[in-house]
Amino acid sequence: EEGKLRKSFRTSVLKGLKNGVSPESPDCLNFTRNYQPTVDAAYLAQAFLRAPKALWEPLDTLTKQRYVTAFKSLRRNKPVYNNHLLFAAIIETFLLKVGEQVDQAKVFLACKKIEEWYVGDGWYSDGPSFSMDYYNDYVIHPMLVDIYQVLKEKKIVSERQYNTAVKRMIRHSD
């Protein structure tokens, strides 16, 4: 029973992903109006990074190219100077992972600023001033670790940098 549900869900998700970038579909996602698409695309790119065999690889070539084009179109958006730097960076990291041209400045700026904003004990400030909020939990730690994992695989950052991010995330979760 559970296997049948899983198969049904996977089929629905893949259909939804295809519809998300099909111009003729009423489910086509917004990648052009205001800044919100960058936030939404960041979580989609992170899902593709975390589950490539389930979410990215099964997509047909046209759908993949449409996502790449949509993600690249978001480069026009300037991120807010806080955890939003990671949204642009994770999109670029996904593009790196799939062999596309990358705006390295977005990735390096995000990593540099987040590292500068580390305040200790597993906490990062969300921009230049510290605020104790939930962004450490579901943006900063998971995205930074996922970015560093790909950069480590590509030999762009050291194992030490990746391990430090993982240790800080573990400390934050304690």
What are these regions (language model features)?
Residues 6-169, 174:
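Aromatic-lined, polymer-binding surfaces characteristic
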